[in-house]
């Protein structure tokens, strides 16, 4: 026998033996214990309502749970889609239910609807992430944890009677791997029965052709297999919601009053509201919770753990222990860290070299600029010296001309000052001669 066969034989688990009991033991009360524990703990159920503003989401929720939830009026002028969760504590008989209704406010109201699904996907992933973080805690308390994971998405389809909008197809395609989708035709009393039947066939055909996976009521449980198989053929449900009571015959029923007649909400000949309530709440609520945990959440959890480096086995199907996974991830991280450090060091060295080259280039440019300025300075200095010498020569020449002019002026002044003296002397001589002549002549 080969070594691999021996290992396979040694690792194989032995078949359990069936034994008969000699008397009553008591573990047949386990189902009762489980029921008692579940009733004590209570249940949580989270519904996501996706549909255009004013399509009747709040009214249908009030009708489904036969109460009035306090909700705010939604506007048609929302800039983007936002998720508005509201939690309520309900009790029926001795069963407590923590119900969370999440409304996609503003869905389909924007001009650009390309990313309308994004806030919805992000919200669903955020609830998965919160649950995963709670699971990964060393001291976790899932018993007291309020599970906010979306268990079902009621997708409200506008009753156009023609086909699905591209927004509906894109959104459901993005959501089908993350949540259980139950498509419903809202305000089904606005189209005729024949149009409604054709519309249902058209919707299911488009969902199948576009690969959209909606929630199928399970048929593996014999207790509900028959009714679920029948209800699967009625999808999508055409519903009418109303909290008003109208008197029909001798009793009051929830209905919508029109001039042409009355549409009874709980009359299966008028709409599929009763079918939706039975499938969603009475028959398949626990399966929706289970599908959310075992299918959608497990897919999210697996992808997240694989991103973190965890895996069940290697290529040879050998299981990894947590310690082995941790050590492998640690080595991978250290090698990546070392590689990053080497890259950063090399980048630093290259940056230093580039900086040195830039500094040398700047130094060379500055030196050339300095030499250029130095030459300009010397040239300017030479020109200034030449100008100074020319100025000195002109000054000396001016001084010489000035001295010559001053000499001429002094000579002229001296000459002009001598002429009056001569005139005085001549006058005196003339007067002397005249007096002499006057004396001698009687």
UniProtKB/Swiss-Prot annotation:
GTP binds at residues 51-58, 106, 187-195, 241, 256. Keywords: Acetylation, Cell projection, Coiled coil, Cytoplasm, Cytoplasmic vesicle, Cytoskeleton, GTP-binding, Membrane, Nucleotide-binding, Phosphoprotein, Synapse. Residues 1-22, 379-442 are annotated as: Disordered. SUPFAM superfamilies: P-loop containing nucleoside triphosphate hydrolases (SSF52540). This is Septin-8. It comes from Bos taurus (Bovine). The gene is SEPTIN8. It is found in: Cytoplasm; Cytoplasm, Cytoskeleton; Synapse; Cell projection, Axon. The modification Phosphoserine is found at residue 10.
């Amino acid at each position: 026998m080969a070594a691999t066969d021996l290992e396979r034989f040694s690792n194989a688990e032995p078949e359990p033996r069936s034994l008969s009991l000699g008397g009553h033991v008591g573990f047949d009360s386990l189902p009762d214990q489980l029921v008692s524990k579940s009733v004590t703990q209570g249940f949580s159920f989270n519904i996501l309502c996706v549909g255009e503003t004013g399509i009747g989401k709040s009214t249908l929720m009030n009708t489904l749970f036969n109460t009035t939830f306090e909700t705010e009026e939604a506007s048609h002028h929302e800039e983007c889609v936002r998720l508005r969760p509201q939690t309520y504590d309900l009790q029926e008989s001795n069963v407590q239910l923590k119900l969370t209704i999440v409304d996609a406010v503003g869905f389909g109201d924007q001009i650009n609807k390309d990313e309308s699904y994004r806030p919805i996907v992000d919200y669903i992933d955020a609830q998965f992430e919160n649950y995963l973080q709670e699971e990964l805690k060393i001291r976790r308390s899932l018993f007291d944890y309020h599970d906010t994971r979306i268990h079902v998405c009621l997708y409200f389809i506008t009753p156009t009677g023609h086909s699905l909008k591209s927004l509906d197809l894109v959104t459901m395609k993005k959501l089908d791997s993350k949540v259980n989708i139950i498509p419903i035709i809202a305000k089904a009393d606005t189209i005729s029965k024949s149009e409604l039947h054709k519309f249902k066939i058209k919707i299911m055909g488009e969902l199948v052709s576009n690969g959209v996976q909606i929630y199928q009521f399970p048929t593996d449980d014999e207790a509900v297999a028959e009714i679920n198989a029948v209800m699967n053929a009625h999808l999508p449900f055409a519903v009418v919601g109303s909290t008003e009571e109208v008197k029909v015959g001798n009793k009051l029923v929830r209905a919508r009053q029109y001039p042409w007649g009355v549409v009874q909400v709980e009359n299966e000949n008028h709409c599929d509201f009763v079918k939706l309530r039975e499938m969603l709440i009475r028959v398949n609520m626990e399966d929706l919770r289970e599908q959310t945990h075992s299918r959608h959440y497990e897919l999210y959890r697996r992808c997240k753990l694989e991103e973190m480096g965890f895996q069940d086995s290697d290529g040879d199907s050998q299981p990894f222990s947590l310690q082995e996974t941790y050590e492998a991830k640690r080595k991978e991280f250290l090698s990546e860290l070392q590689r990053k450090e080497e890259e950063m060091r090399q980048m630093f060295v290259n940056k230093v070299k580039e900086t040195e080259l830039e500094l040398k280039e700047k130094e060379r440019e500055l030196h050339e600029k300095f030499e250029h300025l130095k030459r300009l300075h010397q040239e300017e200095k030479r020109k200034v010296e030449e100008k100074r010498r020319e100025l000195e020569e002109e000054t000396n020449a001016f001084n010489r001309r000035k001295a010559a002019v001053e000499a001429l002026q002094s000579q002229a002044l001296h000459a002009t000052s001598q002429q009056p003296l001569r005139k005085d002397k001549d006058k005196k001589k003339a007067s002397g001669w005249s007096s002499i002549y006057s004396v001698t002549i009687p």
